[in-house]
Every structure is written in structure tokens, then in C-alpha cells.
């Protein structure tokens, strides 16, 4: 199982947004962005376009009383680093989960379900990856 998938599962398990959780978001974002700028892979393109923006949204709307002031400014910095195209995906996924949730379900599970119903096909052998 790819390393980033392990990290994403860890994100789903985490209920409390601690400093480690915040820094993991930053690490995933910088790692995937660097990988894509260097050519990237289909798996990392999927994470960059869907998983990472939505996870940042979860981080942005979550309340962490212990770190509220420090994390608040960190969230603003993160928000401005997300490309415009990913911000659009951000809003769409947020609305899909928000409208689709009729009970108190942990947001991580909601995001996982939403992300997995987004149409996406792995790259076929020999197919040229489009920018």
C-alpha cells in the first residue's frame, strides 16, 4: 500500500486535530505538489486533486480550542497555497458531503465516501497523461 494512503488512513482515524495532524496535512500537500511538478503519478494526481483539498477543508472548518489562534493563521496560510482549480473541487466536495449527511457522521468517513464516488479511472498502460 502506498505511503500516502497509509497517511490518509491515519487522517481518518484521527479525531482530535493536534499539531502532528496539522503538520501531516502540510507534509502531504508539499510532497504531492513536488511530485506532480516533477511529472507525478496517477495516484498522486488523484490525491492532489481530491483528497488533499478536501482534507484541508476539514482542517479549516474544524474547531481546536487548544490551538485555535495559532492554527487559525496556519489555516489562512494553507488556504492561499491551494491552486484555484483545487479550490473549486474543494467547494464541490464540501457541498456533496454537507447536503448528503443526514446524521452525525464523522467528517473523515464522509469525505472518504464522497471522494470514492467521484468518477476517476486509473491511467491505462500506454496512455499519455494529460496536463
From Swiss-Prot:
Kindly list the GO CC terms recorded for this protein. Answer: membrane
Q: Which domain of life is it from?
A: Eukaryota
Segments spanning the bilayer are 3-23, 41-61, 98-118
- Could you list this entry's UniProt keywords, alphabetically sorted: Membrane, Transmembrane, Transmembrane helix
Location(s) in or outside the cell: Membrane
Q: Does the keyword Membrane apply?
A: yes
| Topology with respect to the bilayer | Multi-pass membrane protein
| Location (main, coarse) | membrane
Quote the record's miscellaneous comment. Answer: Partially overlaps ERG27.
* Record protein name field: Putative uncharacterized protein YLR101C
**What species does this protein belong to?**
Saccharomyces cerevisiae (strain ATCC 204508 / S288c) (Baker's yeast)
Amino acid at each position: 500500500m502506498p505511503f500516502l494512503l497509509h497517511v490518509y488512513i491515519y487522517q481518518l482515524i484521527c479525531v482530535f486535530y493536534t499539531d502532528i495532524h496539522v503538520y501531516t496535512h502540510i507534509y502531504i500537500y508539499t510532497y504531492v505538489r513536488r511530485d506532480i511538478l516533477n511529472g507525478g503519478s496517477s495516484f498522486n494526481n488523484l490525491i492532489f486533486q481530491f483528497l488533499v483539498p478536501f482534507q484541508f477543508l476539514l482542517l479549516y472548518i474544524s474547531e481546536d480550542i487548544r490551538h485555535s489562534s495559532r492554527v487559525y493563521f496556519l489555516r489562512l496560510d494553507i488556504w492561499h497555497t491551494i491552486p484555484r482549480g483545487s479550490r473549486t473541487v474543494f467547494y464541490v466536495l464540501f457541498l456533496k458531503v454537507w447536503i448528503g449527511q443526514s446524521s452525525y457522521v464523522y467528517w473523515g468517513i464522509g469525505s472518504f465516501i464522497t471522494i470514492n464516488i467521484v468518477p476517476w479511472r486509473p491511467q491505462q498502460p500506454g496512455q499519455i497523461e494529460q496536463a
